[in-house]
């Protein structure tokens, strides 16, 4: 996948001068998770997102975590590398303002970037700092991996560069969460055409299976939004309704700790 051109943006690691590289020792996860790591490494190699590396100074371990849908995801434990990098001060938008801005929009389009972070390349001189160790070898990322301290601000910069003329007008973006907001059906296609043209210019690809177009309501950053504003999320309501009533004073106190007055 070609991804965003380097001249537009690439992810750099501003490692503090004098920071000592850390090489984590190989961890041995359960056999089924080792098998999943092997599959992920093969997939990432084929996609060109990682490459083999020899004698890296920094070395981290992969971690397998469950996703909301029950499937597994391989992340890298960049705790040590992240400690050596100062926080990027680039501002992220306020979630409440993004959510509130969708009120009054009759139709919404929710867009999902295909392998979002991997569409941004790592700076070549920083690739080997992302190295990780597995039972079958050591690898580093050629694209921006999930888990790096400042990956979010870098992606926010990317959306600001590509959609800057639209943000606040007919598009809102929080890192890789994008929503096209349309006041009425007559302008829907115009708003989408403008968005697609800008994304195409930046070579940002979308995942059509995860995009939703022209709907009156949908989930955005954990909220259910519509033309009326924020609405109660049915999934969260069901979770509360399914809770067992407290059967002891201790359980009552625990409930009060979760929902303080």
Protein language model regions, located:
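Retroelement reverse transcriptase polymerase core
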Residues: 1-261
């Amino acid at each position: 996948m070609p991804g965003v051109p380097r001249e537009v943006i690439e992810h750099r690691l501003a490692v503090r001068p004098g920071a000592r590289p850390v090489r984590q020792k190989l961890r041995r996860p359960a056999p089924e998770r080792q098998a999943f790591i092997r599959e992920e490494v093969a997939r990432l190699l084929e996609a060109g997102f990682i490459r083999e590396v020899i004698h890296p100074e920094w070395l981290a371990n992969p971690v397998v975590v469950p996703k909301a849908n029950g499937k597994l995801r391989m992340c890298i434990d960049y705790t040590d590398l992240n400690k050596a990098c100062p926080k990027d001060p680039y501002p992220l938008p306020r979630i409440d303002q993004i959510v509130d801005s969708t009120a009054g929009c009759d139709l919404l389009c929710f867009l999902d970037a295909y392998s979002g972070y991997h569409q941004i390349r790592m700076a070549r001189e920083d690739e080997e700092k992302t190295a990780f160790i597995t039972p079958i070898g050591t690898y580093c990322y050629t694209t921006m991996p999930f888990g790096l301290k400042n990956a979010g601000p870098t992606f926010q910069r990317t959306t600001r560069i590509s959609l800057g003329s639209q943000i606040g007008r007919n598009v809102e973006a929080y890192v890789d969460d994008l929503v096209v907001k349309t006041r009425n059906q007559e302008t829907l296609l115009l708003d989408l055409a403008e968005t697609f043209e800008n994304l195409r210019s930046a070579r940002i690809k979308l995942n059509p299976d995860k995009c939703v177009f022209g709907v009156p309501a949908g989930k955005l950053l954990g909220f259910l939004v519509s033309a009326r504003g924020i609405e109660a999320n049915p999934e969260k309501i069901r979770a509360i309704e399914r809770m067992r009533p407290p059967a002891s004073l201790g359980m009552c106190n625990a409930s009060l700790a979760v929902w303080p007055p």
